[in-house]
């Protein structure tokens, strides 16, 4: 039986939705010099490299969220010619094979693909025995998420949930963390097959937005809402490799799912590795191997 670690027990007691609502309002406030002071402190505290931003001037950002979702100079993130490229800056939390329907979270903790995908077993079956990668975006990272490959948007599902932190300690301590936190599930169809990008919320993550929809989970009220789904069968929503697909307004985690025999990860990819948007992530799997 998977049990929670005592080290994360206080998170069960915190009013996480209320704290996140408050943080979102602060992050969107135009507070002049106070906003600049907050951004300056954040840059110092987390070692943010502003030289990579299109706009490195801290004083010019009207809100903290405007700073947090700042675009990068794209010449700093060249797009690999590999079949699949890394969709975000961050650290690899875990990656590997989906064992039946089970995805590895941390030692002693697995969760099911169906649970991650909002209980949709039929959708989850596409990924049984496939591959997954979990990418953690720390506070210092660039927080836009990009396309790993050319693909058409097929479905999007919003699943309300909890808002535990997604740092390493919490990942080790909270069973089924990514399948219980609030998340936005994006399903794509590429020339190689379907895949899922799951944008997982966390404590004080202001909201999640996609380029085709805008903000999916606006922080205008406390607490969870119902599951919502959008289908794009009749729409021609095609995004190219390297295009922005979404962003976090305060950071979190991306979980990627691929069917069996679809991809072969870059051999250099391993848990704990620092990664950058645009680098080689994977190639199309060789069926003969």
Curated annotation (Swiss-Prot):
Function comment: Catalyzes the formation of phosphatidylethanolamine (PtdEtn) from phosphatidylserine (PtdSer).
Gene Ontology CC: plasma membrane
GO terms of biological process kind: phosphatidylethanolamine biosynthetic process
Pfam family, one: PS_Dcarbxylase
Protein name as it appears in the record: Phosphatidylserine decarboxylase proenzyme
Pathway field: Phospholipid metabolism; phosphatidylethanolamine biosynthesis; phosphatidylethanolamine from CDP-diacylglycerol: step 2/2
Reaction equation(s) it catalyzes: a 1,2-diacyl-sn-glycero-3-phospho-L-serine + H(+) = a 1,2-diacyl-sn-glycero-3-phosphoethanolamine + CO2
Residues where Pyruvic acid (Ser) is found: 252
NCBIfam families: PS_decarb
Record-linked InterPro entries: PS_Dcarbxylase (IPR003817), PSD-B (IPR033177), PSD_type1_pro (IPR033178)
Record text on subunit structure and interactions: Heterodimer of a large membrane-associated beta subunit and a small pyruvoyl-containing alpha subunit.
Cofactor note: Binds 1 pyruvoyl group covalently per subunit.
Species for this entry: Nitrosospira multiformis (strain ATCC 25196 / NCIMB 11849 / C 71)
Residues at the site labelled Cleavage (non-hydrolytic): 251-252
EC number: 4.1.1.65
Family the entry assigns: Belongs to the phosphatidylserine decarboxylase family. PSD-B subfamily. Prokaryotic type I sub-subfamily.
Domain of life: Bacteria
MF GO annotations: phosphatidylserine decarboxylase activity
Post-translational modification: Is synthesized initially as an inactive proenzyme. Formation of the active enzyme involves a self-maturation process in which the active site pyruvoyl group is generated from an internal serine residue via an autocatalytic post-translational modification. Two non-identical subunits are generated from the proenzyme in this reaction, and the pyruvate is formed at the N-terminus of the alpha chain, which is derived from the carboxyl end of the proenzyme.
Active site annotation, chain numbering: 89 (charge relay system), 146 (charge relay system), 252 (charge relay system), 252 (schiff-base intermediate with substrate)
Cofactor dependency: pyruvate
